[in-house]
Amino acid sequence: MKKIYPNAYFNNVLEIKISFLIKNKIKALILDVDNTLIDYDKNLSEDIIKWSCELQGQGIKMYILSNTNKKEKVENVAKKLEIPYEYFAKKPLKKGFYKVQKELNLKPQNIGVVGDQIFTDIIGGNRCNMFTILVDPVDKKDFWYTAWKRPIENKLKAKIKEQK
């Protein structure tokens, strides 16, 4: 049951500050794309680009790990943020997380996994002993393969918010 709970919860990625990362000994972030960085219509905000630049400028490594099989979509976001990426990761399976960890050359506890889904991002990161950060979805609109899980995730998020 512990695997479904994140180490931290924020309304969005912009709330994740360098002071929080330093306090928690996080040297890198593994980022989800859909509804974490971009909305349903594939828009990446200037604020997120700026946030990414600021954190990278302060030594935080970043890497995209996405379940989408649409390489071009992930590649476009990665180029704008100037970070490496892996797509079609099959989260919550461990393989993609371990591959990124190896490339980052860091211990799992020094890597933060940031995503909007408990059943992929959070469980996957927790299974790999990484520091997990749950954020609310950027957009209310979801793809069909995500939408069915949201009511369950919303109940869990309510419990997480109570504990905050």
What do these predicted ranges mean?
Residues 2-31, 42-43, 50-61, 65, ...:
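Asp-based, Mg2+/Mn2+-dependent phosphohydrolase catalytic module
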